């Protein structure tokens, strides 16, 4: 997956996450202290993981849960995030981990994430997640299973393309209306001033 699909996917999921974040700020069953959100050792799985976290989160603790993957865009939706504690989870290294792998690749330091190891599939068991290639993650998907990460990226690009086309159409329509109004105003002003100019010309000739 190239950088453009990831960028479009991240943008779309960022908007969705901001729209769906909990009104209370600190999502259950986590605890919060300032901008630190602690969801560690709460038995969280993909299904029970909070859909979003406060956008000003600077430190997120997900250590010691039952997470095999993270929803795409979950970490990208936290622009202030400086540290994510993700150890002691049974990560399944297949195409579902592509968003997390991309997020890790963008971190300035990989040392804090060297304890992230693949538990499955057998071919990748024990491997350090930050050093598993994207092609290896894609290849780990079951035969015939479309990598939903790539599918979401394509859908995101389609939605963004449609939004851009709609915005362009609205801007062009607005521009046409402004030009039509300016033309009508010019014609109206000319129709008002032309008789005065003609009358002034006749007066000067006499």
From Swiss-Prot:
TM region positions = 148-172
UniProt LRR repeat ranges: 60-83
Q: Where is the LRRCT domain?
A: 89-143
One Pfam family it belongs to:
LRRNT
InterPro entries hit by this protein: Cys-rich_flank_reg_C, GPIb-IX-V_Complex, LRR_dom_sf, LRRNT
The entry annotates sugar attachment on 66
* Cytoplasmic compartment residues: 173-206
As for subcellular location, the record says: Membrane
Q: Name one GO biological process term.
A: blood coagulation, intrinsic pathway
Domain named LRRNT is located at: 27-55
Task: Please list the residues that carry the modification Phosphoserine.
Answer: 186, 191, 200
Please name the Gene3D superfamilies in this protein's record.
Ribonuclease Inhibitor
Q: What does this protein do?
A: Gp-Ib, a surface membrane protein of platelets, participates in the formation of platelet plugs by binding to von Willebrand factor, which is already bound to the subendothelium.
Could you describe the subunit structure of this protein?
Answer: Two GP-Ib beta are disulfide-linked to one GP-Ib alpha. GP-IX is complexed with the GP-Ib heterodimer via a non covalent linkage. Interacts with TRAF4.
What's the protein called, per UniProt? Platelet glycoprotein Ib beta chain
Organism name: Mus musculus (Mouse)
């Amino acid at each position: 997956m190239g950088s453009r699909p990831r960028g479009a996917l991240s943008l779309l999921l960022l908007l969705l996450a901001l729209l769906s974040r909990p009104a209370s700020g600190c999502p259950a069953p986590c605890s919060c202290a300032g901008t630190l959100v602690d969801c560690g050792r709460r038995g969280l799985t993909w299904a029970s993981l909070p859909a979003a976290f406060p956008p000003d989160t600077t430190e997120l603790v997900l250590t010691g849960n039952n997470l095999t993957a993270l929803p795409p865009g979950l970490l990208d939706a936290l622009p202030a995030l400086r540290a994510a504690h993700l150890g002691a989870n049974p990560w399944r290294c297949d195409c579902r981990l592509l968003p997390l792998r991309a997020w890790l690749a963008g971190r300035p330091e990989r040392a804090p994430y060297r304890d992230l190891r693949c538990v499955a599939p057998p071919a990748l068991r024990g491997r350090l997640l930050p050093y598993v290639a994207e092609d290896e993650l894609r290849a780990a998907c079951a035969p015939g299973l479309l990598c939903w990460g790539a599918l979401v990226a394509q859908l995101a690009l389609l939605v963004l393309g449609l939004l851009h086309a709609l915005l362009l159409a609205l801007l062009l329509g607005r521009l046409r209306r402004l030009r039509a109004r300016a033309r009508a105003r010019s014609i109206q002003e000319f129709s008002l001033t032309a008789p005065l100019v003609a009358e002034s010309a006749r007066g000067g000739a006499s």
